[in-house]
Design a protein with these regions (language model features):
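Catalytic-core regions of core metabolic enzymes
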Residues: 183-738
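Long, contiguous binding/interaction regions
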Residues: 2-204
Length: 738
């Protein structure tokens, strides 16, 4: 057994045609073909003499044989050339070319050339990582490279790459040897570069300086008009430009006849025109320098083969222009933070600002989710309806939210995974600092079919999804409502240090329900110490149950609630508290609520600031609104803490939410897993078998024999196993084993 380096981010993206640049723009990347000869020749012809010299050690153009070799990537065991393309003056051209060519079976020579305008954008670094992953898969162990000693930019790429490097300088030329195994520090640097580029690409979309809406009609019911009206009503801080060639103005705001006339600095354009007109709108936006798009229009991959082909063309066009796109077939994006206040969607509801960010793959559900957030008083930071996820996906948004100062909790409504391996790697890292709560729809066969027709989603096995979430630290919620139950706890309460929970109630029935739900959720009922028991006995009536749950009985008034909550919250043997209140006399409800808040505040002042508190108010209007608790800080008496205690309509909801949060806290407390391997594993054999099963039968269970072969490939010892098809067969076979 030996520890190995975790995989490079480029390994998750090796087949992706999108290349992220450091400045937040994107480009297309693919392996060369013989049809690229003329484009490659033209690329080198347009390079400056200095760039040619740095690539070929001469300012002369490369020979035809060199061009031919770069144009042939049919056998990556011999050579591979990656070409980066962008649309320049409506012409798709190479802007960077990187190659490796075999020296022998273990060593390949690597070289790069980047167009002068695209240098210093991280292109060479990204291409080096992709080439390294591809070369490793072909059995290469090292790259070798040569560069002039004064080519500081290229030397910086190699030295900052994270690969182990040996170098020597002779006559002004540096000869380098790069191991294709990256150090853990190098992997972390690579992940950070990937995160920075992804976040930079989404900043113009989520924090734009100005927004255009393409397809704003005079009719108030049109989607473009609804987005335009929502932007104005939401209080967006920057200019809003409606685009309509047939209208002079919309509600007094002058219209532009074409997106090509948008002024500089228009970061985001929302496109709401019929699907056949979207490509032209994209080209117009690119000509005006727009950096990001939200395509609300439907009629793409969710609409059949013709729409799927149109979506493929759309994504290529957007990528070749260097832009990012949400959608198509989405409801828009929203940023509720005070300094942005952008509702670039057709949601009629603007949520209160908060610290929860949300992704929804369904537009219609997105509207309901925003309304539920308002009802539950869970404030949102950003909301993105990704629709068909043709470009921007949940993985991109996770990296944006990872360091977003306005996001503490991440919520996901998913119908599919585009790249589950990448999701697992990102979620495992991000969940260490910010909780991720997900609802994954399509749990049944019928649900999978519905998801596919709804947003062109490719659903995954529910068993696989559970395993993915558990390993990645993602909190899975079964319903949207449960997702908000969990979010309400996470956004306002500390993570528990353990699973010991105490329950305070004034009615036995709800207390019993709470106990059952807590145990089912994996929580432990705290055993009160003699000190805690004595403290409760000092003021509670003899009829009260001093155990856990603490049943103060129906006659308990505000004072009993205040003192009991404080006593239990400050008990060392308690990690979390659920307070249940069943209004027996509504005339004292307000006073009792205040007393519970006072008890929580007293417990906080006494030092119990690290314990989550959840409340449950039964059969009372507004029961799910958070309880507001104000108290002087335990660290600074002049500072008043304003705490929101989540409230639930039934004890089971509170218990389930606390159980999910406690399990997440336990996962987060564990040290990050190390990557281990064994030299005698036959991973390729197991992988090939599983792929053959998927190709033959789709996502399904392995047979007994297939399972045995997979486990055997991983060196796991198996007991003798036989298959019984009837109860009598099982009894007969069991007798054979004693």
């Amino acid at each position: 057994m030996r520890e190995i380096t975790p995989p490079l981010p480029a390994g998750d993206l090796i087949d992706s045609p999108r290349l992220m640049l450091r400045d937040g723009t994107v480009a297309s990347v693919r392996a060369s073909t013989p049809a690229d000869r003329d484009a490659i020749r033209r690329f080198f012809h347009d390079l400056s003499p200095e760039s040619l010299r740095n690539r070929f050690f001469t300012s002369s153009q490369p020979s035809a044989s060199v061009i031919d070799r770069m144009s042939d990537s049919t056998d990556p065991a011999q050579a591979l050339t990656l070409i980066v393309h962008r649309l320049l003056s409506d012409d798709l051209r190479p802007v960077a070319i990187a190659s490796y060519m075999a020296v022998n079976s273990r060593v390949a020579e690597v070289a790069f050339a980047v167009g002068d305008v695209f240098q210093r954008r991280g292109v060479s670094t990204a291409l080096l990582e992709r080439l390294a992953v591809s070369a490793s898969r072909q059995g290469f162990q090292r790259f070798q490279a040569s560069t002039f000693a004064d080519n500081h930019a290229m030397l910086e790429v190699f030295r900052d790459s994270g690969f182990e490097i040996r170098s020597k300088t002779d006559a002004g030329v540096v000869e380098l040897q790069l191991s294709l195994t990256m150090s853990p520090e190098g992997v972390r640097s690579s992940e950070e570069r990937d995160r920075i580029a992804s976040a930079a690409s989404l900043a113009p979309m989520l924090t734009p300086s100005a927004v255009a809406v393409i397809g704003v009609s005079r009719e108030s019911a049109g989607l473009g008009r609804r987005v335009f009206d929502a932007l104005r009503a939401g209080g967006f801080k920057g200019p809003i430009y409606p685009v309509n060639p047939l209208a002079a103005d919309i509600d007094g705001v002058p219209c532009l006849p074409s997106a090509r006339e948008l002024p500089p600095g228009t970061d985001l354009a929302v496109i709401a025109v019929p699907a056949p007109l979207v490509l032209a709108a994209v080209d117009d936006c690119a000509a005006a320098g727009v950096k990001s798009l939200v395509v609300i229009s439907a009629g793409f991959a969710e609409a059949g083969d013709t729409g799927r082909a149109l979506q493929h063309t759309l994504v290529e066009r957007v990528r070749n222009h260097g832009m990012r796109m949400v959608g198509p077939n989405c409801m828009g994006v929203l940023n509720a933070t005070a300094n942005v206040r952008m509702n670039a969607s057709f949601s009629p509801v603007v949520p209160a600002p908060g610290r929860v960010s949300l992704l929804s793959q369904s537009g219609a559900l997105g509207i309901a989710i925003i309304e539920l957030a308002r009802e539950r008083q869970v404030g949102l930071s950003t909301f993105v309806s990704v629709g068909n996820k043709a470009d921007v996906s949940g993985n991109d948004l996770l990296q944006y939210w990872e360091r977003d100062p306005d996001t503490d909790v991440i919520l996901l409504y998913l119908e599919s995974f585009g790249n589950p391996r990448r999701f697992a790697r990102l979620a495992r890292r991000i969940a260490r600092s910010k909780p991720i709560v997900a609802v994954k729809a399509g749990r049944t066969t019928a649900g999978v079919r519905a998801a596919g027709s709804h947003t062109a989603a490719l659903a995954a096995s529910d068993v696989a999804v559970n395993a993915l979430f558990q390993q990645s630290g993602v909190i899975r919620a079964d319903t949207i409502d449960e997702m908000f139950d969990i979010a309400a706890c996470l956004e306002s309460q500390p993570l528990p240090a353990g699973a010991r929970v105490a329950i305070v109630t004034n009615a036995g029935g709800p207390g019993i329900l709470a106990v059952d739900a807590c145990v089912a959720a994996g929580l432990q009922m705290a055993d009160f110490s003699p000190a805690t028991t004595a403290r409760l006995q000092a003021f509670l009536p003899p009829e009260a149950n001093i155990g856990n749950p603490v049943d103060m009985i129906a006659s308990a008034g505000p004072d009993e609630y205040r003192r009991t909550v404080e006593a239990v919250l400050t008990a060392d043997e308690v990690d979390a508290l659920i307070v249940i209140y069943t209004p027996v006399d509504r005339r004292t409800s307000a006073e009792t609520h205040a007393a519970i808040a006072q008890g929580i505040g007293a417990g906080r002042r006494a030092g119990s600031v690290g314990k989550p508190v959840l409340s449950c108010v039964i059969a009372e209007p507004g029961a799910r609104a958070p309880m507001l608790v104000d108290y002087p800080s335990a660290f600074d008496p002049d500072l008043v803490v304003h705490e929101r205690v989540p409230s639930y309509g039934f004890p089971e909801n509170a218990a389930r939410a606390l159980g999910r949060v406690t399990a997440y806290a336990a996962w987060r407390a564990q040290p990050p897993a190390l990557y281990w391997t064994f030299d005698d594993l036959r991973v390729d054999e197991a992988r090939d078998l599983c792929r053959a099963v998927v190709d033959a039968r789709g996502g399904t269970w392995l047979t007994g024999e297939e399972t045995r072969r997979v486990l055997n490939a991983f060196g796991l010892p198996l007991l003798p196993t036989v298959l019984a098809r009837t109860a009598d067969d099982a009894a007969a076979l069991a007798s054979m084993f004693g």
